[in-house]
Amino acid sequence: MTNTRKTHPLXKIINHSFIDLPAPSNISAWWNFGSLLGLCLIIQILTGLFLAMHYTSDTMTAFSSVTHICRDVNYGWLIRYMHANGASMFXICLFLHVGRGMYYGSYTYFETWNIGVILLFAVMATAFMGYVLPWGQMSFWGATVITNLLSAIPYIGTTLVEWIWGGFSVDKATLTRFFAFHFILPFIIAALVMVHLLFLHETGSNNPSGLISDSDKIPFHPYYTIKDILGVLLLVLTLMALVLFSPDLLGDPDNYTPANPLTTPPHIKPEWYFLFAYAILRSIPNKLGGVLALVFSILILMLFPLLHLSKQRSMMFRPLSQCVFWIWVADLFTLTWIGGQPVEHPFIIIGQLASILYLTIILLILPTVSMIENKLLKW
């Protein structure tokens, strides 16, 4: 008699995705972040659902409702801080997952890669709208500053901003719609994840060598299920250490002050995972130019398959490209640091140089170095 997991219509899909899936025998720990992102999404949806049961999306009561969750709801503080710090873990996993794809040339699966970039945009939008919900000072001013960027769009800009606001400033209508979008987007993300996996399983996983691994495949279960469990344990350990020991480490103290449209915080800045993009935005003196640079700083990921000029897929055997890649990573750290600094000398010029380097490495230096390596290998 045949096994139910191989015949049952539903169990068959799960079997082909997580059990009998042929996987390369040599994928490293860098391949763990896909499953960790799935876990992060589940944690965020569950904690978010419980928070939504007690949260009120009204300007008068939003801040108080978050305080009520932390003080009066059973383990409300735990749920709230798991959700807030879960977002940080989500972003760390995202950056490492994308970085892995760049290093090992996974972007040559361009449907999987492009859906991944769309997912990145969707997660960033969700995180931004979630940051507005507690209705603290940084929530309010962050929403005001970021939505105002759309006014840089010629002709329709101002109308568009007022349409998004639902009025002439960030107010009750804005908060209510942001809550609605923040609630629905994670489910759209979950659906996109399915499509992401669908396209990935058409080709199978890449591996560190970048070579075709069809001749050497092993079943996903038990080998990679047990490996994923190790990743899960480390992620949960890190998240819980953060939540239980220093839950406000990555937050902004300004968000413990209720939103006040009459006083502006001295330094308006987003959550740490947006600081690199914020630094790029601020490094251009022109409003429209800054907005375009901000969008392009993420959209540039879609160009990776076109900019790949090396004869090898992975960077595993390309030491020159490796050096350039790690310089680019260091540049990202520099941008993150600059994004959190005030707009004054010497931070302005450092931010501008780091922004130029960020784009130049991707558009010019990496493709050039790839061609040099081809020549060195007489290809």
From Swiss-Prot:
Gene Ontology BP, a term: mitochondrial electron transport, ubiquinol to cytochrome c
Record key words, sorted: Electron transport, Heme, Iron, Membrane, Metal-binding, Mitochondrion, Mitochondrion inner membrane, Respiratory chain, Transmembrane, Transmembrane helix, Transport, Ubiquinone
Lineage: Eukaryota, Metazoa, Chordata, Craniata, Vertebrata
PANTHER family xrefs: CYTOCHROME B
Binding residues for a ubiquinone: H201
Quaternary context: The cytochrome bc1 complex contains 11 subunits: 3 respiratory subunits (MT-CYB, CYC1 and UQCRFS1), 2 core proteins (UQCRC1 and UQCRC2) and 6 low-molecular weight proteins (UQCRH/QCR6, UQCRB/QCR7, UQCRQ/QCR8, UQCR10/QCR9, UQCR11/QCR10 and a cleavage product of UQCRFS1). This cytochrome bc1 complex then forms a dimer.
Organism: Spermophilus relictus (Relict ground squirrel)
Residues bound to heme b b562: H83, H182
The protein, known as: Cytochrome b
